[in-house]
Amino acid sequence: MISTTTHSVEGHEITDYVGIVNGEAIMGANVVRDFLAGISDVIGGRSAAYEDKLAEGRQIAVREMEDRAAQLGADAVVGVMLDFETLRDGMLMCVATGTAVKLRRRS
C-alpha cells in the first residue's frame, strides 16, 4: 500500500476516489518515563522515551489507515495528514487521515 502526503502518486493516474480513511492510536505513558522526560525537558535534552512512543503511535495509526483503505479495495492513500495530541493522564494520541484511491500505472 502506498501512503503519501502528496495528492498524487508519481507514475500513476488516480482512477477512483474510494473515500476518506483514518487510523488512530491512543497509548499510555508510564510514570517513570514521564518523570525522566520531565528531567530532560528541564535540562534541555530530548526525551527518547516519548520520541519512541510517538513513532510507535504513528506506525500503528498509519497501518490502521492503510488496512481500512485495503478493505475498500484501494491501491493507495493520498493527502495523508498526521495529528498528535496529548490527552489527560499521560495518554498520547496519533491520528492518520487520508483519501483512499485506486491507481493505474501511466504508460
UniProtKB/Swiss-Prot annotation:
Gene3D superfamilies: Hypothetical protein apc22750. Chain B. Signal peptide: none annotated. It comes from the Bacteria. InterPro entries: UPF0145_dom_sf, UPF0145_YbjQ-like. Belongs to the UPF0145 family. HAMAP family: UPF0145. PANTHER family: UPF0145 PROTEIN YBJQ (PTHR34068:SF1). This is UPF0145 protein BH1111. The lineage of its organism: Bacteria, Bacillati, Bacillota, Bacilli, Bacillales.
